[in-house]
């Protein structure tokens, strides 16, 4: 494990003593009083996000919803029991037509008559239970796969949050080092300005030369403010991704850690897993459509009491009579206007498209892995090169300052050397950013990025 601490070289060379102390002080005081700010490791930030990030909470709720939907479909196999009751009072009893021939009258003639009593009470308990229903079995299979999809979607969101927080954390570290670089350059510029002012007092340089150094110092101060503002914005974004209040004062570890030449074992990416689960879902839906042509069988039973009442004295009464039955109901779909056939054709085309999408995701993933590996290798080499460039630029700057004191170097030479040093420092930081991003991307594409890694 390589570390970029308060050194900017793989070798044992360090900043000059003043610059080194200033760098340490700046890292410690960057967010104010260090006693008021907790130092968070990258893993702590990720663990906090896993608990408080709202997107992850939403996806966890979606997983719970899919679990409840599966239980809901399974509950359709459980017997259903219902109770019904009603009371009816007839102001006018219902009429019936009686054939007169039943009483010796002529054929084809009827006589109206009223039957029944005014008070009618019915109470029934009914039971129904599916014995064989292909639609229910298909729905159970489909909701199980839908639950798997929601779990994969949660994993995908988890990886995205991991990726986002890691990038933000690295950006905060990089911005901290940029501020330290600017502070170091401010120290060098302040020294140069002091020397130039002394030389001006001795009439060895002009006021214009002093103004150039003063301008460079002001430019560095402006750059310092811009970086500090960017740092605050990135910190707020990091807090948002972690799900903690913006008012909470945090600081990240100053050390930038990265591992070189690590080979990741390739696992199916979360996107590939998601497309595969969607393919299984479509296949399950297709099978459900085909099975909808099969008959369904259910058991039914009922028990009840029917009451009849008459309330006129002296013949008033209220009597109840039982009624019950049990049976089997069979439902067979015969013809629905080719609707099912058209739905099956549509689902077959959807499966074909999803299979093509799965192949596309696999090919795209292989391409992105190859590109990420190349990018990581290039940035790894760039880090080594820029480290040497920083050491060389420091030597050139220090030698130029000495030559300027001896009168053999001009102010322009010093400014050029200083700019070269700053450029080397910025190139070094950019190389680290590119390496860490390429490494994160490679971990994501190979299925190695997660909260557990």
Give the predicted meaning of each segment:
Residues 1-18:
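N-terminal secretory signal peptides that target proteins for export/translocation
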Residues 68, 152-154, 158-268, 375, ...:
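Periplasmic alpha-helical coiled-coil/stalk elements that build and connect Gram-negative outer-membrane
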Residues 21-33:
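Bacterial N-terminal signal peptides
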Residues 37-92, 204, 246-283, 294, ...:
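Bacterial Sec-pathway N-terminal export signals of envelope proteins
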Residues 57-61, 74-75, 131-158, 208, ...:
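Sec/SRP-type N-terminal targeting helices
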């Amino acid at each position: 494990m390589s570390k970029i601490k308060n050194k900017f070289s793989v070798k044992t060379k360090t900043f000059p003593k003043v610059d080194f102390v200033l760098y340490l002080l700046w890292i410690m005081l960057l967010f104010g009083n260090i006693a008021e700010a907790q130092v968070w490791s990258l893993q702590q930030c990720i663990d906090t996000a896993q608990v408080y990030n709202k997107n992850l909470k939403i996806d966890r709720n979606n997983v719970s919803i899919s679990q409840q939907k599966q239980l809901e479909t399974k509950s359709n196999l459980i017997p259903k029991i219902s109770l019904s009751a009603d009371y009816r009072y007839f102001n006018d009893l219902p009429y019936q037509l009686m054939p007169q021939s039943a009483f010796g009258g002529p054929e084809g003639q009827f006589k109206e008559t009223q039957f029944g009593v005014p008070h009618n009470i019915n109470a029934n308990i009914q039971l129904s239970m599916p014995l064989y229903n292909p639609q229910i079995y298909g729905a159970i299979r489909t909701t199980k796969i839908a639950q798997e999809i929601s779990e994969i979607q949660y994993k995908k969101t988890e990886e995205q949050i991991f990726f986002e927080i890691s990038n933000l954390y690295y950006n905060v570290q990089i911005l901290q080092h940029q501020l330290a670089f600017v502070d170091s350059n401010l120290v060098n510029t302040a020294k140069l300005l002091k020397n130039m002012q002394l030389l001006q007092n001795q009439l060895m340089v002009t006021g214009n030369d002093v103004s150039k150094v003063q301008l460079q110092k002001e430019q560095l101060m402006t750059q310092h403010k811009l970086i500090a503002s960017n740092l605050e914005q990135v910190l707020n974004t990091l807090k948002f991704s972690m799900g903690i209040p913006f008012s909470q004062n945090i600081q990240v570890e100053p050390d930038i850690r990265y591992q070189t030449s690590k080979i990741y074992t390739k696992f199916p990416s979360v996107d590939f897993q998601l497309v595969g689960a969607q393919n299984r879902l479509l296949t399950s839906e297709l099978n459900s459509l085909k099975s909808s042509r099969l008959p369904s069988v259910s058991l039914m039973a009922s028990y009840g009491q029917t009451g009849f009442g008459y309330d006129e004295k002296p013949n008033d009464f209220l009597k109840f009579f039982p009624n019950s039955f049990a049976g089997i109901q069979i439902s067979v779909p015969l013809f629905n206007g080719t609707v099912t056939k058209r739905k099956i054709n549509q689902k077959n085309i959807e499966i074909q498209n999803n299979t093509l999408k799965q192949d596309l995701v696999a090919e795209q993933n292989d391409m992105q892995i190859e590109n990420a590996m190349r990018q990581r290798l290039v940035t790894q080499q760039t880090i080594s090169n820029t480290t040497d460039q920083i050491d060389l630029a420091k030597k050139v700057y220090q030698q130029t300052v000495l030559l300027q004191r001896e009168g053999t170097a001009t102010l322009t030479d010093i400014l050029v050397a200083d700019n070269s040093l700053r450029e080397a420092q910025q190139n070094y930081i950019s190389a680290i950013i590119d390496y860490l991003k390429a490494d994160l991307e490679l971990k994501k594409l190979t299925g190695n990025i997660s909260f557990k890694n």
